[in-house]
Amino acid sequence: MKPTLPNYDQSSVLIVGDVMLDRYWGGPTSRISPEAPVPVVKVEKIEERPGGAANVAMNIAALGGDAHLVGLVGEDEPAQALTTTLESLKVHCDFVALPEFPTITKLRVMSRGQQLIRLDFEDSFHDVAAEPIISRMQQALSSVKAVVLSDYAKGALEHVQLMIQEARKVNVPVFIDPKGADFERYRGATLLTPNMLEFETVVGKVKDEDDLVAKGQQIIEEFDFEALLVTRSEHGMTLLRRNMEPLHLPTQAREVFDVTGAGDTVISVLAASVSTGKPLDEACALANAAAGVVVGKLGTSTLSTIELAEAIHGSQDSGFGIIGEEQLISAVKQARARGEKVVMTNGCFDILHAGHVSYLNHAAELGDRLIVAVNTNESVQRLKGPGRPINPTDRRMAVLAGLGAVDWVVPFSEDTPQRLISQVLPSLLVKGGDYAIEDIAGGAEVIAAGGEVKVLNFEDGCSTTGIIEAIKGGRG
């Protein structure tokens, strides 16, 4: 299955669960302490990242979705740091502050890409009354299209059955990242996302895929779930639904540096996708692609819609399609080694029309490979003003990547692609319109490197602005 990217601006998700603050202290180490046989780390870098349910919310917000987060914190400095970080990322925080408990904090000491030690500051929340967290959930349910319950067994989901019932009353789907072997407490949820270890803790050792499917269907029936998404590490994921064939999704991970927070990414992309109207199977395929990206990063990480678009368009494997700058530079080097002529152009391409297609076909005919550099949303807004772009970056790139004339699509955030072009240095740089060669961004750098710059004509009568004005005027 090759899913299409939804418009995550339309997603709205309530996340309830165990929030925590992940702190990273990092630096070089070159000696052993004289006090004990341990390395001495000279701390040069300190990072703070939301973890647990907060990481789920951060992932949804990073995609452009509306994330409303409810959880338990202390009245302390880590709670303030967590709230400040999340709100800067446009996550709406509605925490229950309990002065008798510390905010859950995990401090990791890192050196040379390795974790040397983890220090946990926590006292799991217990015997907390249901009313404060349930009332916050009730207030948020009217404005969301999906609920995620993120369970790290730290106490925030002590009243999880009440939470499931509240969501079911208003027909909002409930997705749960479970913890422990007691699936009874999650009875009635829409979908659970156990990893293989968690799944086998409940059902026993799984012999093969047929056994996994059979035992999974038993779990669905026994606990009144609608579905299970079993994450299986290097074997990918398996989606099991009531009275439907299983869907096995192979892993898309290329390199695994750190699985921290990968489960959070899976459930966040899954819930955000369903909340935009995506069917469950397509949402799971998107979550699988997202997991393949984040395990290649260190620590709890988010991903952008551009990274997700790259993953689902297969650019990492095929070498073509939507691609990042570093990958593009590598791909161009390989193309040159094959003796191929690389052509590059750029633009906003907000509403792709016949004039664009004609222009890109012409550009592609001038060489063997065509790169299209695309202005990001912020760049378009600065150039075109309020109300633009009509289509977000990921969608504009997806449409361009689907054209037969285009080999690579890459985003840039500056007002001009001069820096990007000077890094790529194509054999031929082309631009549409009535530009003078000397006024084309990146042209001087391409010519200095021995390349060419050309201006191509646009097809008369075709323009994005004209299309927008025609729509406003009601003309067909």
From Swiss-Prot:
Record flagged with keyword Transferase: yes
Record-linked SUPFAM superfamilies: Nucleotidylyl transferase (SSF52374), Ribokinase-like (SSF53613)
Name of the top EC class for this enzyme: transferase
UniProt record similarity statement: In the N-terminal section; belongs to the carbohydrate kinase PfkB family. In the C-terminal section; belongs to the cytidylyltransferase family.
Protein's job: Catalyzes the ADP transfer from ATP to D-glycero-beta-D-manno-heptose 1-phosphate, yielding ADP-D-glycero-beta-D-manno-heptose.
Keyword check for Kinase: yes
The entry's keywords: ATP-binding, Carbohydrate metabolism, Kinase, Multifunctional enzyme, Nucleotide-binding, Nucleotidyltransferase, Transferase
Binding positions for ATP per the UniProt entry: 195-198
Pathway(s): Nucleotide-sugar biosynthesis; ADP-L-glycero-beta-D-manno-heptose biosynthesis; ADP-L-glycero-beta-D-manno-heptose from D-glycero-beta-D-manno-heptose 7-phosphate: step 1/4; Nucleotide-sugar biosynthesis; ADP-L-glycero-beta-D-manno-heptose biosynthesis; ADP-L-glycero-beta-D-manno-heptose from D-glycero-beta-D-manno-heptose 7-phosphate: step 3/4
Summary of subunit composition and partner proteins: Homodimer.
InterPro entries in the cross-refs: Bifunc_HldE, Carboh/pur_kinase_PfkB_CS, Cyt_trans-like, PfkB_dom, RfaE_dom_I, RfaE_dom_II, Ribokinase-like, Rossmann-like_a/b/a_fold
Protein's recorded name: Bifunctional protein HldE
Matching PROSITE patterns: PFKB_KINASES_1
Active-site residues (renumbered): 264
Positions of region (Cytidylyltransferase): 344-476
Catalyzed chemical reaction(s): D-glycero-beta-D-manno-heptose 7-phosphate + ATP = D-glycero-beta-D-manno-heptose 1,7-bisphosphate + ADP + H(+); D-glycero-beta-D-manno-heptose 1-phosphate + ATP + H(+) = ADP-D-glycero-beta-D-manno-heptose + diphosphate
Gene Ontology MF, one: phosphotransferase activity, alcohol group as acceptor
Lineage of the species this protein comes from: Bacteria, Pseudomonadati, Pseudomonadota, Gammaproteobacteria, Vibrionales
Gene Ontology cellular component terms for the protein in this record: cytosol
